[in-house]
Amino acid sequence: LINDNISQKDKEVLADFILNSNRFTNGPKVKEFESAWSNWLGVKYSVMVNSGASANYVTMAVTRELKGHHGEIIVPPIGWVSDIASVINTGFTPVFVDVNMKNIAISYENIKNAVTKDTKAIVLVHCLGFNGLSQKIIDLAKEKDLLLIEDCCESHGATFDSKKIGTLGNMSCFSFYFGHHIT
């Protein structure tokens, strides 16, 4: 679908970096980008990893550390496979909750009906540039002591109550894969 979004100038900058650098991970450019990204989002910290899938896995590893090694994670039935694979691969059970047609996100009512004593977190995927949050979802997560994890890979720049998505939950994931759009 996208075959011409990497310009010749982009390729030249990348080639220059590869030819003149001896450090390809966790170098000064990564730190510079983490700082710029944090400033743009309006948050204190950002941690860059190699992919949105890895970011999903990191959020589940953190969930396991904070909430224990077993339990349920509320997830939507649509999104990217890594949202579900990260849940399963860290020992949790995904609980699928249907999305609404307004913003293609799981709704407060469906989340509320799915919460059990074993629920540890909610993975809210913001799809296709939409914001999937509501104050009711934020309040429910706090009331039930659930982690709210925002997958923002498809909705960079979307807002809720004048704040960028990805800043209202406990953790968030973004992806800069070339096929994702920046809203």
Explain the meaning of each model-derived region:
Residues 1-23, 28:
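N-terminal "arm"/small-domain region of PLP-dependent enzymes with the aminotransferase-like
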Residues 23, 28-72, 86-88, 96-98, ...:
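Phosphate-binding glycine-rich loop
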Residues 48, 75, 121-124:
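A short beta-strand submotif of the Rossmann-like class I SAM-dependent methyltransferase core
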Residues 78-84:
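Conserved coil-to-alpha-helix start sites within the AMP-binding
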Residues 91:
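Structured binding elements
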Residues 102-183:
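Active-site phosphate-binding strand-loop segment of PLP-dependent enzymes
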